Amino acid sequence: MLGIREPDIYGRTTYADLCQLIEQHAQKIGAEVELYQSNHEGDLVDKIQKAYGNTDGIVINPGAYTHTSVAILDALKAVAIPAVEVHISEVDKREEFRQISYVRLACFATITGHGVNGYLEAMELIRERYES
């Protein structure tokens, strides 16, 4: 629904546009990326668990699961892969329920309110973590 749902909050960039932007940035910084999107909590947990042992970092926008999913939190903690939480909007300045993030507890950084550029910033943070 990216680009369709509440464009005044999330912008008009589509998911396809976002994927292209991420892939271009990955090529620029010499990173490999695997893009994944699901509306199903269990699928996201499965994907995180499958990343164990073969992934250097996770950039995650858990959407509404940010505020409800102990399962995603536990999956991120279990795999212990450096993770950055990203939100296109500034969730901390929106409704009170959006200010709760379970996922944040398992991430070394959170980027909110930077639009789709937040994903690129998250990639940079993970890269910098491995360079230092």
Which residue ranges define each predicted feature?
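Short beta->alpha junction loops
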Residues: E32-G42
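Short acidic active-site motifs
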Residues: D43-K47, T68
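Short acidic/histidine-rich motifs immediately flanking catalytic phosphotransfer sites
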Residues: A51-I58
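Short, glycine-/small-residue-rich phosphate/pyrophosphate-handling segment
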Residues: E34-L35, V84, D92-S132
